[in-house]
Amino acid sequence: MEQGQNKPDEIFSCTRIAEFQNYLHQEERSRNTITKYIRDLKVFFTFLDGQPMDKEALLDWKKHLTQTHAPASVNSMLASVNKFLDWLELPGLKVKPLKIQRQIFSNPKKELTTEEYRRLIKAAENRLLLQTICSTGIRVSELKFITAESAKTGRAEADCKGKTRIIFLPPDLCRALRHYCRERGIDAGIIFCTRNGCPLDRSNIWKDMKMLCDSAGVEPGKVFPHNLRHLFARTYYALEKDLSRLADLLGHSNVSTTRIYTMESGLMHSRQLSRMGLVFTRT
């Protein structure tokens, strides 16, 4: 084979990945989901490096992933390849995910507190953007549905992941959004967008939030857009103790997913144990 020519297996993988990507589009999967699947598949085919795609190769890849990735990441990547194998009608090649014990407590190094959130808001140039995400619990991908019209009605209709749901906007937020729109001459359409009028994406917001860490005095590991959604969930659950209604507000079809969002670091449990006063020995 001449230099520069692709090997047959490389042509196969590229062609099949492209066809699979088209299939995901037809399934109306979200852009982020499709990007994730395709990225994982490319990693898998790079690992194969021309080897036959058989059960042994899949098990080798799983073993390799366990040595280089966290268990949750391993399962996520295996799920991408298993989806591809289902599409190829090769279910016999699918590999089982790792068994992970359900976490009861969250990592305290990633739990954003209300006080830390206040400091981020104080340090932010566009404070209303962060408050909009945190006070509604929306995904960053749903920010484009927060419009001048929704600021007037107090609700936005979001079409995400093939499902339509209603996002409720608190009255205080609506007033702030309407004032924001008046100042910027926004009469209709998306409120938070780029200079070109395109919706802000996760990378835009992630970068801006990371720049606030030093001035706000908050650990970088706690500062990312999705953590605002987690803070919303924990705050709501602490007030209402209604997991089912919280699932509706977050747009979850499975309450088990919602339960993950309400996990605490365990610091409160530790304080409660300390108040019991059952240790008398002092050092």
Language-model-detected regions and their locations in the chain:
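Conserved catalytic core of the tyrosine transesterase superfamily
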Residues: 1-283
